[in-house]
Amino acid sequence: MSSLKDEVPTETSEDFGFKFLGQKQILPSFNEKLPFASLQNLDISNSKSLFVAASGSKAVVGELQLLRDHITSDSTPLTFKWEKEIPDVIFVCFHGDQVLVSTRNALYSLDLEELSEFRTVTSFEKPVFQLKNVNNTLVILNSVNDLSALDLRTKSTKQLAQNVTSFDVTNSQLAVLLKDRSFQSFAWRNGEMEKQFEFSLPSELEELPVEEYSPLSVTILSPQDFLAVFGNVISETDDEVSYDQKMYIIKHIDGSASFQETFDITPPFGQIVRFPYMYKVTLSGLIEPDANVNVLASSCSSEVSIWDSKQVIEPSQDSERAVLPISEETDKDTNPIGVAVDVVTSGTILEPCSGVDTIERLPLVYILNNEGSLQIVGLFHVAAIKSGHYSINLESLEHEKSLSPTSEKIPIAGQEQEEKKKNNESSKALSENPFTSANTSGFTFLKTQPAAANSLQSQSSSTFGAPSFGSSAFKIDLPSVSSTSTGVASSEQDATDPASAKPVFGKPAFGAIAKEPSTSEYAFGKPSFGAPSFGSGKSSVESPASGSAFGKPSFGTPSFGSGNSSVEPPASGSAFGKPSFGTPSFGSGNSSAEPPASGSAFGKPSFGTSAFGTASSNETNSGSIFGKAAFGSSSFAPANNELFGSNFTISKPTVDSPKEVDSTSPFPSSGDQSEDESKSDVDSSSTPFGTKPNTSTKPKTNAFDFGSSSFGSGFSKALESVGSDTTFKFGTQASPFSSQLGNKSPFSSFTKDDTENGSLSKGSTSEINDDNEEHESNGPNVSGNDLTDSTVEQTSSTRLPETPSDEDGEVVEEEAQKSPIGKLTETIKKSANIDMAGLKNPVFGNHVKAKSESPFSAFATNITKPSSTTPAFSFGNSTMNKSNTSTVSPMEEADTKETSEKGPITLKSVENPFLPAKEERTGESSKKDHNDDPKDGYVSGSEISVRTSESAFDTTANEEIPKSQDVNNHEKSETDPKYSQHAVVDHDNKSKEMNETSKNNERSGQPNHGVQGDGIALKKDNEKENFDSNMAIKQFEDHQSSEEDASEKDSRQSSEVKESDDNMSLNSDRDESISESYDKLEDINTDELPHGGEAFKAREVSASADFDVQTSLEDNYAESGIQTDLSESSKENEVQTDAIPVKHNSTQTVKKEAVDNGLQTEPVETCNFSVQTFEGDENYLAEQCKPKQLKEYYTSAKVSNIPFVSQNSTLRLIESTFQTVEAEFTVLMENIRNMDTFFTDQSSIPLVKRTVRSINNLYTWRIPEAEILLNIQNNIKCEQMQITNANIQDLKEKVTDYVRKDIAQITEDVANAKEEYLFLMHFDDASSGYVKDLSTHQFRMQKTLRQKLFDVSAKINHTEELLNILKLFTVKNKRLDDNPLVAKLAKESLARDGLLKEIKLLREQVSRLQLEEKGKKASSFDASSSITKDMKGFKVVEVGLAMNTKKQIGDFFKNLNMAK
């Protein structure tokens, strides 16, 4: 309830007054072109004794005492601590240790400790009119009258109210004046608002027109007292200004508001265009303990007023009033642009008031005007000063300024605002680190470490020692006791931390501090070529007290990961031999204490285990940078730390027994593995990149541990490990190259375990995959897209760059001869869909119970002989019918077979590539071992060669490939496994047959390792083979040169033709007769994929898959097929193994050393930042899990360059038909697999929660999410419909008002115009032979004109009569002075004149009566007849009177003459 009361009393006080201390110009003038906003360009920090001011285009910060001395005296010069050219500043204030400076469009901050750091905090969407700073919150009123609050700590904006004209805020209260002239008051607590009360204008003031008295400003004088200003609206474009304002003191008591008008507070007589704003300085307890004294100034006035909570105070003396000066340039009043109070500076004030000689302290009011001039006046109260009760409360003053006491810096624009999340996460357990927890990380596949793992290394280590924006920037020295972290910088940080270890922006990014004793770890470790940079901290008892941000010099100890804490340095721990600039670059570290639980350079490792190596225990043997070897041995580090040096040695790997250690997959689950599996415990020393292998009785698992290794070269172990008879299975989640039972492949989670279907893993990249890649794709813990943004340099999806494989992929030929008749028979049987198990062909299987006579029966006995030289690698054996086998697992064999043995190798029966998978498995189920699946198939083509090199040492392949290529290769791996199985079988059959003669061929000096194009022979890593290391080196060099030659070829087809011609010329006729086309089917299968050659490039509508099958007899592989040596010297037909070194040729390259240096120096943190920054971000996750595109659909297959085996034309037609049909089947399988992959991906839902945040990226949505998308769209439509309806309603109201006012008037005018137009048309009608009657309007006009004419005629006649009388008087004066008759006539004439008037009046009345009677009697009449008659009669009477008068005069003169 509001009421209007009497005027506020104004007291002329003898006590209150202002003491003028001085005035000087300190800043440039605005020149009357002030920003149209509430200028608050002066602020004083009494606690810091500093001031900030802005005027013109300059902002300054300086010492307050120096400013006062400069103003009050002429001797002290003024210097500033900081100054900057900033145009159109509208707001400055102190905020803790910073200064806020704002224009209408942006907010800036200045660090008082680092005055050079002037940065942009945020930019405003709409121009700003008014700002207030309170409790770390900036309250903003913009040009569209929206009131919002900007949190200076989080930069988040929250809208408070709309249609706001003005507001004022204190620490606990927010007052708002709305455009409808209503008031609202809110309680302000911790940034949250709660409405206290609201009221509107009294009914008496409601009558004031809004156009003239619009709401302008509201000011809080006390919690219950307000000052409101109403007046005319001023525009920024106005040239001349005149203010007409009404001010009211509002007191709100017990739910009712009383309005009292005042005329003496800052009377608005300003002459400069200003945005209306009221400045105030509140002094609490200055005179009375509970009363406020408010010093008020207005942007529209040059006077300063005092309000003492009860009345307006005016000093009695004019000299004691505070008035701004008149401009010397324009002779106009100046007005304030900033007002502040100073209560801390010192200086004696002489004669402040009457009766007081000097005083040391007064509240000094600093007033900055629009010309940059600063005036200082001191507020005094004579009685209080004399009585000693004049109290200046500094604490209440600072509290009233609403400045934040915290020294926390404001986040600047462009910084990642991760601190919002970190404040909550910092107090959580370490397992909730976004890079350690399986539930919170973007890599949801991460496994948790054992809860009881005893580690000396912190589990909360971030990816690079610490997160990007948070706790230690480059290094974290974690305290040795349990501690927690808060949202601000911890005061308990070690005093010896280096500068770089301090928080970058005051807070830890992820806020986790280890709860276990931990040692310091470097964020970026030691330098690029120096001490450990990534991860493994020193595990010795004594941690470094302080460390450099980048550790020791650039050329020192290992760069990526290992730290040495033992007394002795490591024997050999090079990642790539010896590093380029010092000690091992990537290698492992040594620890004299227990192994760390997760001593990752990345905190907890990015993929579940340590990122770049942990310290091993007890011994200091060398280890791989990536843990164990890619295929059972250490990855890259040779025994003597020289990979390519003269001391290159090959040591034999050891196969550790399984110790019930479960190495987790470093990649996310595909969804098939249960969460329990994803959380399974791993060994405390598991690490994806750099474990000290086999230094204790308990082996340490590795996420990239493809086999166990004690030390030595990664290649040597891989080469020597092939001699073992241990086998592997396709489709299992255990790595085929791991020597430990529980060691799962890091890439085993690409696909589901399809062992029941007998197919290869769904993640296989092409038709033929090497064993490593096959098992990399079997793990259930990863999805394809998660591999491309790894924080460990994309080691998850390892692919070498596919060099121009579209053109250079060449066919690998078999080494020895094989009967063309036998191969033709085999092909015909396959084409006829004959069950191979039913044929019992001993050449292709081990089914010894049923042997039938065949041209190949001579080789049956040698097939099943035990051999220690098993082929290096095979894809022929898949996971089909694993359940029907019962051979011991490869891990069990690893315990019992430390060296290569001659035990029997049970080969699988033939898998017919042309039969359905079920038929093949039916014929082979009885011949397969559960884990013994050695196959000697080979892979041809550039793509398969690339894969071989990748799989051989998968952990380093990514060092050479572009990330885009890695993504493409991985996307290809999401295809159906059946096609891979289909492509492998044929080569497997041939490899078995060739194995019988390969050994004899080797003894006879025949070459058994050839490389055609990029084709490489593959070998299983967990099979062992003894061979010469020097031969491996030599073959590595040969292969390196052959790869360079192959990359220079222009096209694949031309190179194949050329090599085919050369091979035909070099080899014997017998070799030419043995080369059969069916051995090259693997080329068809290999090259049919989009990245495997020219085949299947459906770039046009009628695209076809081009199969280039070419035979080259110069370079052969033992694995390309089963060879038969018909010579007599071939007494023992065994499987050839000399092609093994080829497998390593693609990985043993000199480039590794350069890549090592590159990895040491590249800013790897960028990749890590993307993970830390976008952790949990829906858009980021949607991008990572975006749906796969539907691959190209091939319409046909094109087979060219078929190498015919037979010379018979009929057989050649059969061969050509077979090749064509097989190619068409291959194309069909490829299309089916592509569609299956697409449908499977569309059917999955990788993101549990989808909101409107990711609706802009529609390509990341899948079909099952359509309902969610529809709901979101419906919700948006509902919101938009509400807005639209409101707009429509508003428009209807405007239209109604327009119709009611404007349209009604227009309608009336149109009706009148239409009436007149119709009348004119009728009047203008030529057919009318008579004059039309006048309309009513015309008749009125006619009547009016006639009446006026009548009046004019009457006046003329009267004038004539008077002239005649004048003439008579003239005659009388001249001649008739003595004649009494003339005088008598003159008098009588005057009397007759009155009579004439009466006669005229009577006639008019009679005429009117006649007109009325005629109007009643006749419908139409001649309106002018009566008037005409009247006028004629009037003229007759006039003439008669004139004649009579003349006659009388004539008679008079006649008689006079007669008398004479």
UniProtKB/Swiss-Prot annotation:
Residues 1-500 are annotated as: Interaction with DBP5. PXFG repeats lie at residues 267-270, 532-535, 558-561, 584-587, 842-845. The keyword Phosphoprotein applies. SXFG repeats lie at residues 610-613, 709-712. The modification Phosphothreonine is found at T803. Residues 1223-1460 are annotated as: Interaction with NUP82. Residues 683-704 have a biased composition (Low complexity). One of its GO terms (cellular component) is nuclear membrane. Residues 1086-1175 are annotated as: Interaction with DYN2. The keyword Nucleotide-binding does not apply. Residues 917-936, 960-1002, 1017-1027, 1035-1061, 1068-1092 have a biased composition (Basic and acidic residues). GO terms for molecular function: adenyl-nucleotide exchange factor activity; structural constituent of nuclear pore; transcription corepressor activity. Residues 536-546, 556-567, 582-593, 607-619, 727-750, 757-767, 778-800, 861-889, 942-958 have a biased composition (Polar residues). Its main location: nucleus. The modification Phosphoserine is found at S404, S657, S724, S735, S745, S805, S819, S889, S940. It comes from the Eukaryota. GO terms for biological process: NLS-bearing protein import into nucleus; nuclear pore localization; nucleocytoplasmic transport; poly(A)+ mRNA export from nucleus; protein export from nucleus; ribosomal large subunit export from nucleus; ribosomal small subunit export from nucleus; RNA export from nucleus. SXFGXPXFG repeats lie at residues 462-470, 503-511, 522-530, 548-556, 574-582, 600-608, 624-632. Residues 1279-1320, 1383-1418 form a coiled coil. Keywords: Coiled coil, Membrane, mRNA transport, Nuclear pore complex, Nucleus, Phosphoprotein, Protein transport, Repeat, Translocation, Transport. Present with 1230 molecules/cell in log phase SD medium. This is Nucleoporin NUP159. It comes from Saccharomyces cerevisiae (strain ATCC 204508 / S288c) (Baker's yeast). The lineage of its organism: Eukaryota, Fungi, Dikarya, Ascomycota, Saccharomycotina. The gene is NUP159.
